[in-house]
């Protein structure tokens, strides 16, 4: 029996047929099997890491990095604002209280603000209430920044959140966030093996 015969699935839809549907590249015999194994190995490898907020941001698209940078600059434009990273998010404090948090969920930056989400139910902001999660109890206003218009809305919402703080001027320079591969992130402690 030839090696090409070994690659044929036996009756029904086998794993190889499902892989062929995902990887539409036609390759000869043994190479096809190697490509499929490599594809599934890469998928499996990607699931074996717990990624920190910074790791997600570092490996995000330029659009996500730009939106994050704009929101970061908006928050840092107020006197006394300090930020720090935790595993899940970046927290912004001013006057001794938490005013905002930002994280990346999937491919979307998500902003949490110290505003009451119930006051914004039927508004253009489409706020979500995150108060049921203890880590967002102080910043229950959950707002997805999934478009340029939402960046403008974030500016308005941050202005409302920061009313009691002095505006000192917003930087137009976005933070530089160079891409790093998984190996580098692992070495830096920004991702953990599960």
Residue map of PLM features:
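Well-ordered alpha/beta subsegment
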Residues: 133-192
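Amphipathic alpha-helical interface surfaces
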Residues: 67, 71, 129-132, 154
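Short, conserved beta-strand/beta-arch hydrophobic-aromatic motifs that form part
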Residues: 85-141
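Disordered, low-complexity tails and leader-like regions
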Residues: 6, 22-24, 119-123, 172
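Short, charged low-complexity intrinsically disordered segments located at boundaries
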Residues: 99-108, 184-194
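Generic solvent-exposed, charged/amphipathic alpha-helical segments
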Residues: 72-76, 159
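Charge-rich, low-complexity N-terminal segments
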Residues: 2-72
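A mid-sequence, solvent-exposed acidic-amphipathic segment
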Residues: 76-85
């Amino acid at each position: 029996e030839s090696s090409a015969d070994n690659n044929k699935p036996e009756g029904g839809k086998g794993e190889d047929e499902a892989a062929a549907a995902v990887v539409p590249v036609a390759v000869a015999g043994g190479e096809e099997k190697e490509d499929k194994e490599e594809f599934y190995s890469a998928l499996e490898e990607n699931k074996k890491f717990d990624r920190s907020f910074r790791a997600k941001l570092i490996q995000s698209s330029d659009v996500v990095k730009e939106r994050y940078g704009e929101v970061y600059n908006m928050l840092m434009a107020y006197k006394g604002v300090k930020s720090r990273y935790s595993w899940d998010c970046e927290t912004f404090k001013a006057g001794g209280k938490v005013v905002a948090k930002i994280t990346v969920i999937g491919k979307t930056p998500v902003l949490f603000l110290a505003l009451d989400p119930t006051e914004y139910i039927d508004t253009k902001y489409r706020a979500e209430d995150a108060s049921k999660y203890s880590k967002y109890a102080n910043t229950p206003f959950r707002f997805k920044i999934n478009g340029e218009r939402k960046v403008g809305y974030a500016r308005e919402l941050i202005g409302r959140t920061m009313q009691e703080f002095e505006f000192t001027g917003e930087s137009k320079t976005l933070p530089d966030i160079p891409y790093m591969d998984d190996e580098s992130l692992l070495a830096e402690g920004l991702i953990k093996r599960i």
